[in-house]
């Protein structure tokens, strides 16, 4: 039996000691009086259990005999009729050779077969009585008693004799000590406990090996019990069962297994099968293992296979759990020259995405660990060890241990003598050792789908259009908020915002302007958060902006580009155009696309082409005349064609402009914002430096009309304007008389918000924002400039929210900044300052008595209106309350007014209606006549 990790607390220590002593006393009485019930006809069981001369020197039908003066092994062999080979077979682990055993001197120990000596020892006297003088028998032992005397030793006599002995001993101690009654009681109980322990040991030694680990703290968490029971045992084969139970990490786990061990002259091979059951977490696992042992060496391999699937975790919130599949390989070795010193090596590996190999708070994918350790056994009873484990994630454990290895089949003297450590390391000494395996179930975890979100459809729409976003949100604890990252969309003037309902999952997308030649595809991400702070995965929404000529929700061209900007005007060099056709963001195959030359002289390879499996249709263009060409593409469902950027066919024998580009197509008409034009001049396929380029425009102001190319053949100019309008810039070189035109650009007036043109929705009055607010009252801002297509956002929607038309709803007292972005990517802001007061209707459905209304206002750090004039002022600034969506269902919003001293004495008050302006006096305060309308 191995007992390790045993500790006790100081609390209830006295009660625990008494409990164990009383239990021991009862067991002692049971075994002392009923010891003969264990007799089975074998001589061993007939020995007196209270004869310490025998009990301390016998084990498993063997006598551990100490040679006396003048005795030798040869004499014992002759006098007892035991052959020397039989004696040598029992003493191989004590002596290096048979000759060394024969030389054993007085004081040394020899193991003899107990059954051969049963006649001499079955009638030994009880310790404490007068011994019979030995004659011609083993020295130090008694002679046979007479037959009559033997017959008188019945079980009742033995019990009475033992009781008399212990009573005499107790009386002697009481005579020699002046102690209280507790000492007498404890001494008596201790004697009975010792007897129980002795009898229990004699009984348990026939039932295998037990390992106990008790932790008295933390409700015995960490405690375990394992028991190996041989049920068929021969010299060459052992069949056994093993049971175990443990309470670790607040989980109760049981293990049930069976196996066989086959013993060869120098080694052992074995196998075992286990079922592990976690009763707390309802997890089941199968274990299959193999063993190979030799003297001073043990090895084992174990495989672990789950038998239960995913289910809610027993002690890890918001997770599911199941056993992890895995294996381990273990090696234990000891030095034959110094068997007290041993080493350990183990590798373990488990499989799963979130396996808790180390603890439930540290989860790893397919983790593994290597354990190395050393141990020291100074005497068979005690083993001390230190293990170091290193595993996945750079996890490290350093474990110290001390084990107490109590063997029921060995006398106490053998368990505290260093010379007997060697036997533990042999096959015969470890025959009944427990299976080396991991009895704890290693678990694999999976985060529950407590919060998930998805968008079933991406968005495709024309520039500046508004689209409702369909969100599907599943939340275990309720949705708190959704956070969007629409930065890429905002840079072009679009945004994601709440729709008018302002529910947690009610959003809409406002698309930016279409960028000619750009990708016009935006990736927007969002993440949901629940009321417990959990977050969902990032979900991506793809928004595709189409030009006004394209058709949403129909088969249309989303992109039309050329593979190069110029080609030789030799009627051979070609430019390839690719049109991409999609419907709702999905590529469409087998769709006819028609192509047409909008301007210039050139030849298309085909007037139409069908899209391939990727939704792409291609056509080539060639020309034998220098000049600029524009090509368009269209599907049958499109209302207008989509133009590609202009391309240029050049005469390579002359210096020619091969491309003209702009850095942007829109700018602010403030004489500061500029658009940069870049042209490239080449001749014979090489860039030309020092070439003069002449620029012209039909609108705006160029910073210069001539520019010279650099070493790479580039020349640049800039265009600005102080007035809104569209402009086309052209360029030409002296060797080619034809102008090359750039894409059309547009200048927009500077964007601004006039703070003196704030319109109150309920009255239609335009001016500055009133300093006293009606909660959920609305005003409309007016933006001017830009391209006239605006998107709005608020810095703090809890204070003030804004819709896509610039209508602001005042939600709470405070300040916020409203930003408007135009389609040409200009922005302007308007700051809402904290008002002097805000009128809040705490409850617009249920009328209440004056005192209740006053309490409701105080609960939100506000008060009832001090006078009717306060409410009249609100009405004059905001109009009837029911002109706003929040109050639209209210035909009346009668508000209590703060009582005067005389009103309070009379139990009355005044009211004012924010819908009808009806004013009443001397209204009975105890009746539910008005609403709780508060001033904050």
From Swiss-Prot:
This protein's UniProt keywords: Cell outer membrane, Disulfide bond, Membrane, Repeat, Signal, Virulence
GO cellular component entries: cell outer membrane
Pfam families named among the record's database cross-references: Big_1, Big_2, IAT_beta, Intimin_C, LysM
BIG2 domain sequence ranges: 780-831
PROSITE patterns: BIG1, LYSM
Any GO BP annotation: cell adhesion
Subcellular location: Cell outer membrane
Disulfide bonds: 857-934
Gene3D superfamilies with a match to the protein in the record: 2.60.40.1080, Immunoglobulins (2.60.40.10), Inverse autotransporter, beta-domain (2.40.160.160), Mannose-Binding Protein A, subunit A (3.10.100.10)
Signal peptide: 1-41
Family: Belongs to the intimin/invasin family.
Task performed by this protein: An inverse autotransporter.
Record protein name field: Intimin
Organism encoding this protein: Citrobacter freundii
Lineage: Bacteria, Pseudomonadati, Pseudomonadota, Gammaproteobacteria, Enterobacterales
């Amino acid at each position: 039996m191995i007992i390790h990790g045993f500790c006790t607390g100081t609390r209830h220590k006295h009660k625990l000691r008494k409990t164990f002593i009383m239990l021991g006393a009862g067991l002692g009485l049971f075994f002392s009086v009923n010891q003969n019930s264990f007799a089975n006809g074998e001589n061993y069981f007939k020995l007196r259990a209270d004869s310490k001369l025998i009990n301390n020197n016998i084990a498993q039908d063997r006598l551990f005999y100490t040679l006396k003066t003048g005795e030798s092994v040869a004499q014992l062999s002759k006098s007892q009729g035991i052959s020397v080979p039989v004696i040598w077979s029992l003493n191989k682990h004590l002596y290096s050779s048979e000759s060394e055993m024969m030389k054993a001197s007085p004081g040394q120990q020899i193991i003899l077969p107990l059954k051969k000596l049963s006649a001499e020892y079955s009638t030994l006297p009880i310790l404490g009585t007068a011994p019979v003088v030995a004659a011609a028998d083993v020295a130090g032992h008694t002679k046979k008693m007479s037959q009559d005397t033997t017959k008188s030793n019945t079980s009742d006599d033995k019990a009475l004799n033992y009781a008399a002995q212990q009573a005499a001993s107790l009386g002697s101690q009481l005579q020699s000590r002046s102690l209280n009654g507790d000492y007498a009681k404890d001494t008596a109980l201790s004697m009975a406990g010792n007897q129980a322990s002795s009898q229990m040991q004699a009984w348990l030694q026939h039932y295998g090996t037990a390992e106990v680990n008790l932790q008295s703290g933390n409700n015995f968490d960490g405690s375990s019990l394992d028991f190996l029971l041989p049920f068929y045992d021969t010299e060459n084969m052992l069949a056994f069962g093993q049971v175990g139970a443990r309470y670790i990490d607040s989980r109760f786990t049981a293990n049930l297994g069976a196996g066989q061990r086959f013993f060869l002259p120098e080694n052992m091979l074995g196998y075992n099968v286990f079922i592990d059951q976690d009763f707390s977490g309802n997890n089941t696992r199968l274990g299959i293992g193999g063993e190979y042992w030799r003297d001073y060496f043990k090895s084992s391999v174990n495989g672990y296979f789950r038998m239960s699937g995913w289910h809610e975790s027993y002690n890890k919130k918001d997770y599911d759990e199941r056993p992890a599949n895995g294996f381990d390989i273990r090696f234990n070795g000891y030095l034959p020259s110094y068997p007290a010193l041993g080493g350990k090596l183990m590798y373990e590996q488990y499989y799963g995405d979130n396996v808790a190999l180390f603890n439930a708070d540290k989860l790893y994918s397919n983790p593994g660990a290597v354990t190395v350790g050393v141990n020291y056994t100074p005497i068979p009873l005690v083993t001390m060890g230190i293990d170091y484990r290193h595993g996945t994630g750079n996890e490290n454990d350093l474990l110290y241990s001390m084990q107490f290895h109590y063997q029921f089949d060995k006398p106490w003297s053998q368990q505290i003598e260093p010379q007997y450590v060697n036997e533990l390391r042999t096959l015969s000494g470890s025959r009944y050792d427990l299976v080396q395996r991991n009895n704890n179930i290693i678990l694999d975890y999976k985060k529950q789908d407590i919060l998930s979100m998805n968008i079933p459809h991406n968005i495709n729409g024309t520039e500046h259009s508004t689209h409702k976003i369909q969100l599907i949100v599943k939340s275990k604890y309720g949705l708190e908020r959704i956070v969007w990252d629409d930065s890429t969309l905002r840079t072009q003037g679009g945004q994601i915002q709440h729709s008018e309902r302002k529910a947690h999952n009610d959003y809409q997308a406002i698309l930016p302007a279409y960028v000619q030649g750009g990708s016009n595809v935006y990736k927007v991400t969002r993440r949901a958060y629940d009321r417990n702070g959990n977050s969902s995965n990032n979900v991506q929404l793809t928004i595709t902006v189409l030009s006004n000529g394209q058709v949403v929700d129909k088969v249309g061209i989303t992109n039309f580009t050329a593979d190069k900007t110029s080609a030789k005007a030799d009627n051979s060099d070609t430019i390839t155009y690719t049109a991409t056709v999609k419907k709702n963001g999905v590529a469409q195959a087998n769709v006819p696309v028609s192509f047409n030359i909008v301007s210039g002289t050139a030849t298309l390879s085909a007037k139409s082409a069908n899209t391939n499996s990727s939704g792409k249709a291609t056509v080539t263009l060639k020309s034998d005349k220098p000049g600029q060409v524009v090509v368009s593409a269209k599907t049958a469902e499109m209302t207008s064609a989509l133009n590609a950027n202009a391309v240029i066919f050049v005469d390579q024998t002359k210096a020619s402009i091969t491309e003209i580009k702009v850095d942007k197509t829109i700018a602010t008409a403030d004489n500061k914002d500029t658009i940069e034009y870049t042209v490239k001049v080449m001749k014979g396929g090489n860039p030309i430096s020092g070439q003069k380029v002449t620029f012209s425009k039909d609108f705006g102001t160029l910073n210069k009309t001539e520019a010279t190319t650099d070493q790479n053949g580039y020349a640049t100019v800039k265009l600005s304007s102080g007035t809104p309008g569209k402009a086309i810039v052209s360029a030409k070189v002296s060797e080619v008389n034809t102008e090359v035109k750039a894409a059309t650009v547009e200048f927009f007036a500077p964007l601004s918000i006039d703070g003196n043109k704030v319109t109150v929705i309920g009255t239609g009055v335009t001016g500055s924002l009133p300093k006293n607010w009606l909660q959920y009252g609305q005003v409309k801002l007016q933006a001017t400039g830009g391209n006239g297509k605006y998107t709005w956002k608020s810095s703090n929607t809890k204070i003030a929210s804004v819709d896509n038309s610039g209508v602001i709803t005042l939600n709470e007292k405070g300040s916020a900044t409203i930003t408007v972005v135009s389609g040409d990517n200009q922005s302007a802001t308007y700051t809402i300052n904290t008002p002097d007061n805000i009128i809040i209707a705490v409850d617009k459905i249920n009328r209440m008595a004056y005192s209740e209304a006053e309490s409701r206002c105080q609960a939100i750090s506000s008060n009832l209106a001090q006078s009717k004039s306060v409410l009249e002022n609100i009405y004059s600034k905001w109009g009837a309350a029911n002109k706003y969506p929040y109050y639209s269902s209210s035909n009346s919003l009668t508000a209590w007014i703060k009582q005067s001293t005389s009103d309070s004495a009379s139990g009355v008050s005044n009211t004012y209606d924010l819908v009808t302006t009806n004013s009443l006096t001397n209204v009975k305060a105890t009746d539910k006549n008005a609403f709780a309308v508060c001033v904050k």
